[in-house]
Amino acid sequence: MAITYGERFAVSIASIEEHMRGWLATIAKERLVVRQVNSYHELGLLFRFFATFTILPFDDVAAAHFDRLRQSLRRLGTMDLKIACTALAADVLLLTANRRDFERVPGLRIENWLD
């Protein structure tokens, strides 16, 4: 699929949370401050990267989708479901390499551009 001029990309706040938790856990595991330097650098790069996108909130509409779908999609991870519900609430296409899990979400439009 070709990207056309003017197309915009957005990222779910839940995706940002996942990435932040990963780097914060890495920083917390390091006992030596000198070893935390690179992880803090990477965390800073992450902030700058995500700042280039529109950030989609996990709002009341997304939460309502989440509450409605939680019971029927128990095997879908909480964060993946939050990401899916954010996309549903914003009525956007979700780009993912994880088609198998996300295609179970009713009404969610997904594509894998890595295929």
How should these model regions be labeled?
Residues 1-85, 89, 103:
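PIN-domain endoribonuclease scaffold, especially VapC-family toxins
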Residues 84, 88-115:
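Acidic, PIN/NYN-like endoribonuclease modules and their adjacent C-terminal/linker elements
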